[in-house]
Amino acid sequence: MDHLSLVPYEGGSAGGGGGGGKYKECMRNHAAAMGGQAFDGCGEYMPASPDSLKCAACGCHRSFHRRAAAGIGGGPVFFRPPPPPQPHSHHAALQGFLPSSVPAPAPPPQLALPYHAVPAAAWHHAAAAAAGRAGSETPPRMDDFGPGSAGGSGSGGGGIFGRKRFRTKFTPEQKERMREFAEKQGWRINRNDDGALDRFCVEIGVKRHVLKVWMHNHKNQLASSPTSAAAAAAGVMNPGAGIGLGTGLGTGISGDGDGDDDDTDDSPPRAAVSSPSPSPISV
């Protein structure tokens, strides 16, 4: 309660008119011990006797009552000026490198602060503490940065702080197994298939989230034409299928392709179709 002690005491009658001033309502906080705020609200100062300094209404000393000067309204309550702030470490280091002829910068003058005002030093210390907490995080590891990101030409374009993107490489067997599993599941992972998904990931040695990303990236590419994928798989399994059907030109296989033993063509004669001559192109 330092601001209450600033109320000056002037001699005079205890009725509140001594020294040309008048004492108003009581400003004592009766709930300060409990961490709250409660005032008596007794109004103007009412002494018990002419020589008493205690209020007969609330029992508080006259210093707890707000004093209003005669003819002048009560002004705002002021705190005492805070002590000058101590120089920071970087200021002290700077003063060590300055020549002796250059004086150190003087601290700004301290003015009286109004009621409920917060010193600027408190904001400065709070900002410094916040910056210290932000800079105390664990820095990233050096192996997260690739040599291509040092010049700012990496895929992330973040300069030296661009994180190198890790790409998983799959074997052909893993790709084929993942494609078969994705087609079996309809290129989507249901919640009821978590057990089968975990077992499949353990079998092929691929992590769960890696398989999900692969299915998401190849869904439109492989699932758009399932017939072509099946035909391609059949061609890989039986590469000799489809050879020898038709004329058999350049393959060394005889036969007319009608299934009988002779080499004669039993198909009906085809009508000769004359192709029209191309029209001349004018330049």
Swiss-Prot record:
Q: Which NCBIfam families match?
A: homeo_ZF_HD (TIGR01565), ZF_HD_prot_N (TIGR01566)
- Please list the residue ranges that the record marks as compositionally biased, kind Acidic residues: 257-266
Could you state one GO cellular component term attached to this entry? nucleus
Its recorded name reads Zinc-finger homeodomain protein 8
Which InterPro entries does the entry mention? Homeodomain-like_sf, Homeodomain_ZF_HD, ZF_HD_homeobox_Cys/His_dimer
Spell out the molecular function terms from Gene Ontology: DNA-binding transcription factor activity; transcription cis-regulatory region binding; zinc ion binding
Native source species: Oryza sativa subsp. japonica (Rice)
Q: Biased composition, Low complexity: where in the chain? A: 269-283
